[in-house]
Amino acid sequence: MNLYLSLDLLPTALQENTFVYELYNGNNERISSGNFSDKREGDIITLAENEIVTSNVSIYTLYIYIDGNRDNPISMTNQNFRFNIYGEGTGAIYKENVIQNETTTPSNSSSTFLNTEVLRNQIESITIEKTNVVPNDAKYSKDISSKQDGSVMLWYTDKDNNSLYEISIGSENGSVEANTNGSGMFAYLDNVSTLDLSGLDTSNMTSMSKMFYNSKSLTNIDTSGFDTTKVVNMFGMFSGCTNLKSLDLSNFDTSNVTNMEGVFQNDTNLKEIKLGDNFKTNKVTTMLAMFASCSSLKRVDLSNFDTSNVTTMQSMFYKCENLELLDLSSFKTNKVTNMYCMFAYCTSLKTINLTFFDTSKVTTMQSMFLFCKSIEMLDLSTFTTDGATNIMYMFDTCSSLKSLDIRNASFSSVSKNTSAFNVVNSNVVVYVKNDTEKEFIINTIKNIISDNVIVG
């Protein structure tokens, strides 16, 4: 391989000086040396010809001295210069273009962005550029590459003079690669409304935890170029994006994700979520609060969900106040232990298919249907309460309920059952397991017609 040095920035005061260079391999052996003088900006120096022949990744060290040598260099102040090293041929120099990890996980909008001086609440736009050349009008720039080799640069401008910055992130070859841990990467961006991340390479990311968390002004996120095949953690990924109205995740491959807790939690204006065939959930173990407080969501297609490894569905649809229909017939719940508040405050929910639910391992169903005041029929004929210890407020204020099938459950034997049927319609028809359960229901639902409690 041939190795070259491009003099991208060389002030006049340095142009007459003699520069000495030495190139060492990973064994600290000098493989090339020389000098140059009387050079101008844009000139190219050949550092080595056919000296680097290894096909493996190796570390080389280049020393450059001005009018001196390795043992006796001189120093000059206030003279800025920039060299660019590049190679041609087999074994050419490879730069990863990977963004460095945050040294501190962001905790609020006053946290800094990607280890720079910029605060997250000072940003109004973020653009992925196809170059790492910092423009002259940049107010600030920093090398944010993981290897600190200049392959990924961040800079900002303030073109409208509003003290909010336009952030640019660019790499040498036009592709910016995210690090494996993207936790909080674009979180707490109070003043950013649109994010086009089509130029961000996410193919090596394993964590997208809280990636866009509490970016309250976001109305659009372009994730069409995201490669999520290696991602394991999506905890709170879009949580708190309160102005987000739609999300197209049809390109997401989530076949390795284990944590989907709170992915869309508190996205109060989210009306549409598009999930493609590769949005797999077969490895997911927690869906706690996954859609909680998505209060504008009317429908969501979960027909491809495989929940066979999920252990908690606590508050999964909590306060989805506009949700009208839920078909969960594909859900496998044989490992679920917690259904606390799963559908609580789904006040518009009229139809729900739970006919394939296996609740044999569920210990708490407390407030499961609390304030589902629009639902008229609940077929829970597959529900058992063998492991249940808490059904408090389970059907509290299901005031429109006309038919309830609980023929395989033994609610009377559950120790914590306070207000389980509080404010339930007294005209409801209830299908129960035996006479013991019938008596329990008659004594529990105020003013219920005894003939409406049917055994078998």
Where is each model-derived feature located?
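Glycine-centered loop/turn motifs
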Residues: M1, G42, N50, M76-N78, ...
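Surface-exposed interaction patch
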Residues: M1-G34
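C-terminal, structured domain-capping segment
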Residues: N2-L9, L47-Y94, G182, F186
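Short loop/turn segments at connectors of secondary-structure elements within structured domains
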Residues: A13-N17, T77, A178
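Short beta-strand element of the conserved SAM-dependent methyltransferase core
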Residues: L23-Y24, I64, I128, A292
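Extracellular adhesion/glycan-binding regions together with long Ser/Thr-
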Residues: G26-I66, G150, W155-I169
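Small side chains
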Residues: G34, G87-G89, T223
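Negatively charged
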Residues: Y94-G456
